[in-house]
Amino acid sequence: MGDWSALGKLLDKVQAYSTAGGKVWLSVLFIFRILLLGTAVESAWGDEQSAFRCNTQQPGCENVCYDKSFPISHVRFWVLQIIFVSVPTLLYLAHVFYVMRKEEKLNKKEEELKVAQTDGVNVEMHLKQIEIKKFKYGIEEHGKVKMRGGLLRTYIISILFKSIFEVAFLLIQWYIYGFSLSAVYTCKRDPCPHQVDCFLSRPTEKTIFIIFMLVVSLVSLALNIIELFYVFFKGVKDRVKGKSDPYHATSGALSPTKDCGSQKYAYFNGCSSPTAPLSPMSPPGYKPVTGDRNNSSCRNYNKQASEQNWANYSAEQNRMGQAGSTISNSHAQPFDFPDDNQNSKKLAAGHELQPLAIVDQRPSSRASSRASSRPRPDDLEI
Protein backbone atom coordinates (compact mmCIF):
# COMPACT_ATOMS: atom_id res chain seq x y z
CA MET A 1 0.00 0.00 0.00
CA GLY A 2 3.01 2.32 0.20
CA ASP A 3 3.10 2.65 -3.59
CA TRP A 4 -0.60 3.57 -3.66
CA SER A 5 -0.09 6.33 -1.07
CA ALA A 6 2.78 7.84 -3.09
CA LEU A 7 0.61 7.87 -6.21
CA GLY A 8 -2.23 9.40 -4.22
CA LYS A 9 -0.02 12.25 -2.96
CA LEU A 10 1.08 13.09 -6.49
CA LEU A 11 -2.45 13.07 -7.86
CA ASP A 12 -3.60 15.17 -4.92
CA LYS A 13 -1.34 17.99 -6.10
CA VAL A 14 -2.81 17.74 -9.58
CA GLN A 15 -6.26 18.50 -8.19
CA ALA A 16 -5.16 22.03 -7.26
CA TYR A 17 -4.38 22.81 -10.92
CA SER A 18 -7.34 21.14 -12.64
CA THR A 19 -10.75 22.24 -13.83
CA ALA A 20 -14.01 21.15 -12.22
CA GLY A 21 -14.23 18.16 -14.55
CA GLY A 22 -10.66 17.20 -13.74
CA LYS A 23 -11.36 17.29 -10.01
CA VAL A 24 -14.40 15.02 -10.44
CA TRP A 25 -12.27 12.64 -12.51
CA LEU A 26 -9.65 12.52 -9.78
CA SER A 27 -12.34 11.84 -7.17
CA VAL A 28 -13.62 8.92 -9.24
CA LEU A 29 -10.05 7.67 -9.64
CA PHE A 30 -9.34 7.84 -5.91
CA ILE A 31 -12.59 6.54 -4.44
CA PHE A 32 -13.87 4.07 -6.99
CA ARG A 33 -10.61 2.74 -8.34
CA ILE A 34 -7.61 3.02 -6.07
CA LEU A 35 -9.46 2.71 -2.78
CA LEU A 36 -11.74 -0.09 -3.96
CA LEU A 37 -8.89 -1.91 -5.68
CA GLY A 38 -6.74 -1.75 -2.57
CA THR A 39 -9.42 -3.12 -0.24
CA ALA A 40 -12.28 -5.22 -1.63
CA VAL A 41 -11.05 -6.29 -5.06
CA GLU A 42 -7.62 -7.43 -3.92
CA SER A 43 -9.15 -9.58 -1.19
CA ALA A 44 -11.67 -11.10 -3.61
CA TRP A 45 -8.90 -12.20 -6.00
CA GLY A 46 -6.54 -13.28 -3.23
CA ASP A 47 -7.19 -17.02 -3.76
CA GLU A 48 -7.47 -16.78 -7.51
CA GLN A 49 -4.82 -19.33 -8.48
CA SER A 50 -4.86 -21.44 -5.34
CA ALA A 51 -8.62 -22.08 -5.60
CA PHE A 52 -8.46 -22.89 -9.33
CA ARG A 53 -9.00 -26.70 -9.55
CA CYS A 54 -9.12 -29.11 -12.49
CA ASN A 55 -10.43 -32.72 -12.57
CA THR A 56 -7.04 -34.29 -13.21
CA GLN A 57 -4.02 -35.45 -11.22
CA GLN A 58 -1.52 -34.66 -13.95
CA PRO A 59 1.21 -32.40 -12.56
CA GLY A 60 1.33 -28.99 -14.23
CA CYS A 61 -2.08 -29.30 -15.88
CA GLU A 62 -3.77 -26.82 -13.53
CA ASN A 63 -1.06 -24.21 -14.02
CA VAL A 64 -1.25 -24.49 -17.80
CA CYS A 65 -5.05 -24.26 -17.81
CA TYR A 66 -5.01 -21.26 -15.48
CA ASP A 67 -2.52 -19.45 -17.71
CA LYS A 68 -4.75 -20.11 -20.73
CA SER A 69 -7.94 -18.90 -18.99
CA PHE A 70 -6.37 -15.82 -17.35
CA PRO A 71 -3.25 -14.56 -19.15
CA ILE A 72 -3.14 -11.69 -16.65
CA SER A 73 -4.88 -11.31 -13.33
CA HIS A 74 -7.75 -8.84 -13.17
CA VAL A 75 -6.15 -7.05 -10.24
CA ARG A 76 -2.84 -6.56 -12.04
CA PHE A 77 -4.65 -5.56 -15.21
CA TRP A 78 -6.56 -2.82 -13.38
CA VAL A 79 -3.35 -1.66 -11.70
CA LEU A 80 -1.75 -1.23 -15.12
CA GLN A 81 -4.86 0.59 -16.31
CA ILE A 82 -4.69 3.05 -13.41
CA ILE A 83 -0.98 3.65 -14.00
CA PHE A 84 -1.39 4.30 -17.72
CA VAL A 85 -4.41 6.52 -17.19
CA SER A 86 -2.61 8.53 -14.49
CA VAL A 87 0.63 9.06 -16.46
CA PRO A 88 -0.76 11.91 -18.66
CA THR A 89 -2.04 13.65 -15.54
CA LEU A 90 1.35 13.27 -13.88
CA LEU A 91 3.03 14.74 -16.97
CA TYR A 92 0.70 17.72 -16.70
CA LEU A 93 1.70 18.01 -13.04
CA ALA A 94 5.37 18.04 -14.10
CA HIS A 95 4.56 20.93 -16.45
CA VAL A 96 2.89 22.77 -13.56
CA PHE A 97 6.01 22.30 -11.43
CA TYR A 98 8.10 23.62 -14.32
CA VAL A 99 5.92 26.74 -14.51
CA MET A 100 6.19 27.23 -10.75
CA ARG A 101 9.97 26.96 -11.01
CA LYS A 102 9.94 29.57 -13.78
CA GLU A 103 7.82 31.78 -11.57
CA GLU A 104 10.42 31.63 -8.80
CA LYS A 105 13.19 32.62 -11.22
CA LEU A 106 11.14 35.47 -12.69
CA ASN A 107 10.23 36.78 -9.25
CA LYS A 108 13.87 36.70 -8.19
CA LYS A 109 14.91 38.56 -11.35
CA GLU A 110 12.09 41.06 -10.85
CA GLU A 111 13.28 41.81 -7.32
CA GLU A 112 16.81 42.41 -8.59
CA LEU A 113 15.52 44.80 -11.26
CA LYS A 114 13.44 46.71 -8.72
CA VAL A 115 16.51 47.12 -6.52
CA ALA A 116 18.39 48.47 -9.54
CA GLN A 117 15.47 50.77 -10.31
CA THR A 118 15.76 52.38 -6.90
CA ASP A 119 19.38 53.24 -7.79
CA GLY A 120 18.20 55.19 -10.85
CA VAL A 121 18.60 52.52 -13.54
CA ASN A 122 15.91 52.46 -16.23
CA VAL A 123 14.57 48.89 -16.13
CA GLU A 124 10.95 49.57 -17.09
CA MET A 125 11.20 47.62 -20.35
CA HIS A 126 12.76 44.60 -18.61
CA LEU A 127 9.97 44.60 -16.02
CA LYS A 128 7.38 44.65 -18.81
CA GLN A 129 9.09 41.70 -20.47
CA ILE A 130 8.93 39.76 -17.20
CA GLU A 131 5.20 40.49 -17.00
CA ILE A 132 4.75 39.13 -20.53
CA LYS A 133 6.65 35.96 -19.64
CA LYS A 134 4.48 35.48 -16.57
CA PHE A 135 1.38 35.90 -18.68
CA LYS A 136 2.70 33.42 -21.24
CA TYR A 137 3.35 30.83 -18.54
CA GLY A 138 -0.12 31.49 -17.06
CA ILE A 139 1.08 32.98 -13.76
CA GLU A 140 -1.38 35.24 -11.97
CA GLU A 141 -0.57 38.10 -9.57
CA HIS A 142 -0.77 36.09 -6.35
CA GLY A 143 1.22 33.12 -7.62
CA LYS A 144 -1.81 31.26 -8.95
CA VAL A 145 -1.22 29.31 -12.14
CA LYS A 146 -3.89 29.70 -14.80
CA MET A 147 -4.22 27.35 -17.74
CA ARG A 148 -3.29 29.19 -20.91
CA GLY A 149 -0.79 28.80 -23.71
CA GLY A 150 1.51 25.81 -23.36
CA LEU A 151 -0.02 24.74 -20.06
CA LEU A 152 -3.47 24.60 -21.63
CA ARG A 153 -2.17 22.57 -24.56
CA THR A 154 -0.52 20.12 -22.18
CA TYR A 155 -3.78 19.76 -20.29
CA ILE A 156 -5.74 19.05 -23.49
CA ILE A 157 -3.16 16.49 -24.62
CA SER A 158 -3.35 14.76 -21.23
CA ILE A 159 -7.14 14.50 -21.55
CA LEU A 160 -6.82 13.00 -25.03
CA PHE A 161 -4.31 10.39 -23.91
CA LYS A 162 -6.40 9.49 -20.86
CA SER A 163 -9.39 8.88 -23.12
CA ILE A 164 -7.30 6.79 -25.52
CA PHE A 165 -5.95 4.64 -22.68
CA GLU A 166 -9.43 4.13 -21.24
CA VAL A 167 -10.77 2.89 -24.58
CA ALA A 168 -7.69 0.72 -25.22
CA PHE A 169 -7.90 -1.06 -21.86
CA LEU A 170 -11.62 -1.65 -22.23
CA LEU A 171 -11.03 -3.30 -25.61
CA ILE A 172 -8.15 -5.39 -24.26
CA GLN A 173 -10.25 -6.56 -21.32
CA TRP A 174 -13.13 -7.51 -23.61
CA TYR A 175 -10.75 -9.40 -25.94
CA ILE A 176 -8.96 -11.37 -23.19
CA TYR A 177 -11.78 -12.58 -20.93
CA GLY A 178 -14.88 -10.47 -21.56
CA PHE A 179 -16.88 -8.78 -18.82
CA SER A 180 -18.14 -11.85 -16.96
CA LEU A 181 -16.66 -15.00 -15.45
CA SER A 182 -18.06 -18.51 -15.75
CA ALA A 183 -17.80 -21.19 -13.09
CA VAL A 184 -16.34 -23.91 -15.38
CA TYR A 185 -13.52 -23.60 -17.94
CA THR A 186 -12.64 -26.33 -20.43
CA CYS A 187 -8.94 -26.87 -21.09
CA LYS A 188 -7.01 -29.14 -23.45
CA ARG A 189 -3.31 -28.34 -23.43
CA ASP A 190 -0.13 -30.26 -22.80
CA PRO A 191 0.70 -31.84 -20.36
CA CYS A 192 -3.02 -32.54 -19.72
CA PRO A 193 -3.73 -36.15 -20.91
CA HIS A 194 -7.16 -35.18 -22.26
CA GLN A 195 -9.73 -32.36 -22.18
CA VAL A 196 -10.29 -31.39 -18.56
CA ASP A 197 -12.75 -29.14 -16.72
CA CYS A 198 -11.46 -26.48 -14.37
CA PHE A 199 -13.48 -24.68 -11.70
CA LEU A 200 -13.21 -21.05 -10.59
CA SER A 201 -13.70 -19.82 -7.04
CA ARG A 202 -16.49 -17.21 -6.40
CA PRO A 203 -17.25 -16.37 -10.05
CA THR A 204 -20.39 -14.31 -9.27
CA GLU A 205 -18.61 -12.01 -6.82
CA LYS A 206 -15.78 -11.45 -9.24
CA THR A 207 -18.22 -10.72 -12.06
CA ILE A 208 -19.85 -8.01 -9.94
CA PHE A 209 -16.50 -6.33 -9.40
CA ILE A 210 -15.68 -6.60 -13.11
CA ILE A 211 -18.94 -4.88 -14.05
CA PHE A 212 -18.36 -2.22 -11.41
CA MET A 213 -14.88 -1.44 -12.73
CA LEU A 214 -16.30 -1.36 -16.25
CA VAL A 215 -18.87 1.25 -15.22
CA VAL A 216 -16.15 3.32 -13.52
CA SER A 217 -14.06 3.22 -16.70
CA LEU A 218 -17.03 4.38 -18.79
CA VAL A 219 -17.76 7.20 -16.32
CA SER A 220 -14.12 8.30 -16.45
CA LEU A 221 -14.21 8.25 -20.25
CA ALA A 222 -17.40 10.34 -20.27
CA LEU A 223 -15.83 12.84 -17.86
CA ASN A 224 -12.79 13.15 -20.11
CA ILE A 225 -14.96 13.86 -23.15
CA ILE A 226 -17.08 16.41 -21.26
CA GLU A 227 -13.97 18.13 -19.92
CA LEU A 228 -12.42 18.22 -23.38
CA PHE A 229 -15.47 19.99 -24.82
CA TYR A 230 -15.57 22.32 -21.80
CA VAL A 231 -11.96 23.39 -22.24
CA PHE A 232 -12.45 23.82 -26.00
CA PHE A 233 -15.55 26.00 -25.72
CA LYS A 234 -14.01 27.98 -22.86
CA GLY A 235 -10.99 28.75 -25.03
CA VAL A 236 -13.24 29.87 -27.89
CA LYS A 237 -15.26 32.04 -25.50
CA ASP A 238 -12.11 33.70 -24.14
CA ARG A 239 -10.91 34.49 -27.65
CA VAL A 240 -14.25 35.98 -28.60
CA LYS A 241 -14.15 38.23 -25.55
CA GLY A 242 -10.57 39.21 -26.32
CA LYS A 243 -9.17 37.94 -23.02
CA SER A 244 -6.60 35.55 -24.41
CA ASP A 245 -3.78 38.14 -24.94
CA PRO A 246 -4.11 41.43 -23.02
CA TYR A 247 -0.48 42.31 -23.75
CA HIS A 248 0.59 43.38 -27.19
CA ALA A 249 4.09 42.36 -28.17
CA THR A 250 5.89 43.23 -31.37
CA SER A 251 9.10 41.43 -32.31
CA GLY A 252 9.64 40.29 -28.75
CA ALA A 253 9.29 43.78 -27.25
CA LEU A 254 6.42 45.56 -25.65
CA SER A 255 4.67 48.31 -27.53
CA PRO A 256 5.01 51.60 -25.63
CA THR A 257 2.06 52.79 -23.63
CA LYS A 258 0.49 56.00 -24.88
CA ASP A 259 0.32 58.72 -22.27
CA CYS A 260 -2.71 60.81 -23.13
CA GLY A 261 -2.69 62.79 -19.92
CA SER A 262 0.61 64.60 -20.31
CA GLN A 263 0.84 67.85 -22.27
CA LYS A 264 3.33 67.85 -25.12
CA TYR A 265 4.81 70.50 -27.43
CA ALA A 266 4.40 70.15 -31.16
CA TYR A 267 5.95 72.04 -34.06
CA PHE A 268 3.62 74.14 -36.18
CA ASN A 269 5.33 75.95 -39.07
CA GLY A 270 8.67 75.24 -37.44
CA CYS A 271 7.67 76.46 -33.98
CA SER A 272 6.67 74.46 -30.94
CA SER A 273 3.53 75.03 -28.94
CA PRO A 274 1.61 73.08 -26.32
CA THR A 275 -0.88 70.75 -27.86
CA ALA A 276 -3.18 67.94 -26.85
CA PRO A 277 -2.76 64.37 -28.10
CA LEU A 278 -3.95 63.68 -31.59
CA SER A 279 -7.56 62.69 -31.98
CA PRO A 280 -8.53 59.61 -33.96
CA MET A 281 -10.04 61.87 -36.68
CA SER A 282 -6.74 63.64 -37.50
CA PRO A 283 -5.76 63.48 -41.18
CA PRO A 284 -3.00 61.05 -42.13
CA GLY A 285 -0.53 63.82 -43.04
CA TYR A 286 -0.99 65.70 -39.79
CA LYS A 287 2.00 64.68 -37.69
CA PRO A 288 3.12 67.22 -35.10
CA VAL A 289 6.59 66.52 -33.81
CA THR A 290 7.30 66.95 -30.15
CA GLY A 291 10.19 69.21 -29.41
CA ASP A 292 11.76 71.89 -27.25
CA ARG A 293 10.48 75.44 -27.02
CA ASN A 294 14.01 76.81 -26.87
CA ASN A 295 14.66 76.17 -30.57
CA SER A 296 16.37 79.06 -32.41
CA SER A 297 13.87 78.93 -35.27
CA CYS A 298 11.05 79.39 -32.78
CA ARG A 299 12.70 82.41 -31.22
CA ASN A 300 13.16 83.98 -34.67
CA TYR A 301 9.54 83.25 -35.43
CA ASN A 302 8.45 84.97 -32.20
CA LYS A 303 10.68 87.96 -32.94
CA GLN A 304 9.20 88.42 -36.40
CA ALA A 305 5.70 88.20 -34.99
CA SER A 306 6.52 90.86 -32.37
CA GLU A 307 7.93 93.26 -34.96
CA GLN A 308 4.89 92.79 -37.17
CA ASN A 309 2.60 93.55 -34.23
CA TRP A 310 4.45 96.83 -33.56
CA ALA A 311 4.23 97.81 -37.23
CA ASN A 312 0.50 97.18 -37.27
CA TYR A 313 0.10 99.23 -34.10
CA SER A 314 2.01 102.20 -35.61
CA ALA A 315 0.00 102.10 -38.82
CA GLU A 316 -3.25 102.07 -36.86
CA GLN A 317 -2.24 105.14 -34.85
CA ASN A 318 -1.17 107.00 -38.00
CA ARG A 319 -4.50 106.17 -39.63
CA MET A 320 -6.55 107.33 -36.64
CA GLY A 321 -4.54 110.58 -36.45
CA GLN A 322 -3.86 110.34 -32.77
CA ALA A 323 -1.60 112.94 -31.19
CA GLY A 324 1.89 112.20 -30.24
CA SER A 325 4.75 110.60 -31.99
CA THR A 326 4.27 107.35 -33.75
CA ILE A 327 6.20 104.28 -33.05
CA SER A 328 8.39 103.24 -35.88
CA ASN A 329 8.81 99.64 -36.83
CA SER A 330 12.53 100.06 -36.90
CA HIS A 331 12.52 101.37 -33.34
CA ALA A 332 10.09 98.78 -31.97
CA GLN A 333 11.57 96.36 -29.55
CA PRO A 334 10.42 92.80 -30.02
CA PHE A 335 9.29 90.69 -27.12
CA ASP A 336 11.69 88.09 -26.02
CA PHE A 337 10.44 84.67 -25.00
CA PRO A 338 12.99 83.23 -22.63
CA ASP A 339 12.48 79.75 -21.41
CA ASP A 340 11.16 78.87 -17.98
CA ASN A 341 14.58 77.97 -16.63
CA GLN A 342 16.03 81.37 -17.51
CA ASN A 343 13.06 83.15 -15.94
CA SER A 344 13.40 81.17 -12.75
CA LYS A 345 17.13 81.90 -12.60
CA LYS A 346 16.55 85.63 -13.08
CA LEU A 347 13.85 85.78 -10.45
CA ALA A 348 15.99 83.78 -8.06
CA ALA A 349 18.86 86.21 -8.54
CA GLY A 350 16.62 89.15 -7.63
CA HIS A 351 16.39 90.77 -11.09
CA GLU A 352 13.11 92.21 -12.25
CA LEU A 353 11.84 92.40 -15.77
CA GLN A 354 12.09 95.89 -17.28
CA PRO A 355 9.02 97.25 -19.09
CA LEU A 356 9.36 97.96 -22.77
CA ALA A 357 9.67 101.56 -23.90
CA ILE A 358 6.84 102.11 -26.34
CA VAL A 359 7.22 105.94 -26.75
CA ASP A 360 10.08 107.41 -28.77
CA GLN A 361 11.79 110.09 -26.60
CA ARG A 362 13.72 111.75 -29.45
CA PRO A 363 12.54 115.21 -30.62
CA SER A 364 10.60 115.31 -33.80
CA SER A 365 12.29 116.78 -36.85
CA ARG A 366 10.91 119.79 -38.71
CA ALA A 367 10.03 117.69 -41.70
CA SER A 368 8.02 115.38 -39.59
CA SER A 369 6.34 118.36 -37.81
CA ARG A 370 5.31 119.96 -41.09
CA ALA A 371 4.18 116.64 -42.41
CA SER A 372 2.09 115.97 -39.33
CA SER A 373 0.46 119.51 -39.47
CA ARG A 374 -0.81 119.11 -43.02
CA PRO A 375 -4.51 118.32 -43.30
CA ARG A 376 -5.43 114.92 -44.64
CA PRO A 377 -8.64 113.99 -46.43
CA ASP A 378 -9.72 111.68 -43.64
CA ASP A 379 -9.13 114.23 -40.81
CA LEU A 380 -12.11 115.41 -38.80
CA GLU A 381 -13.03 119.11 -39.05
CA ILE A 382 -13.86 120.95 -35.81
UniProtKB/Swiss-Prot annotation:
Covalent crosslink: Glycyl lysine isopeptide (Lys-Gly) (interchain with G-Cter in SUMO): 144, 237
Topological domain spans for side Cytoplasmic: 2-23, 98-155, 229-382
Keywords: Acetylation, Cell junction, Cell membrane, Disulfide bond, Endoplasmic reticulum, Gap junction, Isopeptide bond, Membrane, Phosphoprotein, S-nitrosylation, Transmembrane, Transmembrane helix, Ubl conjugation
Pfam families tied to this protein: Connexin, Connexin43
UniProt biased composition (Polar residues): 317-332
S-nitrosocysteine, modified sites: 271
Positions of the UniProt region annotated as Interaction with UBQLN4: 264-382
Transmembrane segments annotated in the record for this chain: 24-44, 77-97, 156-176, 208-228
Bilayer topology: Multi-pass membrane protein
Coiled-coil boundaries: none
Post-translational modification: Phosphorylation at Ser-325, Ser-328 and Ser-330 by CK1 modulates gap junction assembly. Phosphorylated at Ser-368 by PRKCG; phosphorylation induces disassembly of gap junction plaques and inhibition of gap junction activity. Phosphorylation at Ser-368 by PRKCD triggers its internalization into small vesicles leading to proteasome-mediated degradation.
Subunit organization: A connexon is composed of a hexamer of connexins. Interacts with SGSM3. Interacts with RIC1/CIP150. Interacts with CNST and CSNK1D. Interacts (via C-terminus) with TJP1. Interacts (via C-terminus) with SRC (via SH3 domain). Interacts (not ubiquitinated) with UBQLN4 (via UBA domain). Interacts with NOV. Interacts with TMEM65. Interacts with ANK3/ANKG and PKP2.
Family the UniProt entry places it in: Belongs to the connexin family. Alpha-type (group II) subfamily.
Protein name per the record: Gap junction alpha-1 protein
Gene label: GJA1
